[in-house]
């Protein structure tokens, strides 16, 4: 199925696979599972509540939260209400939050799962705040009350390719955070390109979302890719439960920055020292058993596509994981190009490179040897 916009994808799965699990959200007291039908009702009610707040069409609504089911529901509700999302990194300080709220001209903010909201709250003074009680965020407006008090929106607007969908602020590694304006069309094109390039063979694919959804790689590679595939989204409860939560999920696609791969490698070698691992992998009868046990422990037993990016990774480390049947594909992209750039792909992986241009991408070098990227 070829979709034309994020809401087209969501409403398709909501209608055609309503009982498919959409979210598995762990809490300290237990996990909450939400189907596409149940999520749709909640999203539509929040969208109706946002419309009732009577902001001008295409107003900016900020989103301050760590990854969780409510992050994605809020994103879809903002789209359904005809507004534009402004995700904010959940770890930045109050001054930076205030700057982004002002610069983006955001009218309101949805506040969800955070480590220390009290230290950030002053950055939201003067703005309408919607708190999510499930994450102990108490504000004048409460998400759960809005769900209880509103009817579900029935008329979902059609999204046009040229419509502004979101303003994504860069992490600031190249200076002050810059607000990158992405349209419905740019999100749709890159997601459809990724779906065509990365063949996930699973009837109900599973995804594990832990890198910030405010980052373009997670926003496209997990949220949008998973949404277009009609998959389920799983999240870690905390850093302490990360390994167990990932192992319980066994996702079909996984993305990690190089420092995560180093942690995985250290964890494996702590359990099986290198000399012992070399010996076990050299024994034909045992090596496949060892590989499967390691992959299952990591949560990568069923993973069909594994990616890394955002920083360099050594060829020696890629080769080390390859011996364990973990084929890590390096990719390259920017917030500014909506990560539609260069990818190694499963079965076409060349270590020491970031792969070939994706379909529709053109590349050249400037006289100063800058990489210039253009896409449709």
PLM features: residue spans?
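Conserved AMP-binding/adenylate-forming core of the ANL superfamily
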Residues: 22-68, 72-76, 93-98, 102, ...
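A short helix-loop-beta submotif of the ANL/AMP-binding
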Residues: 60, 66-86, 90-94, 102-108, ...
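ANL superfamily adenylate-forming
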Residues: 115-161, 268-297
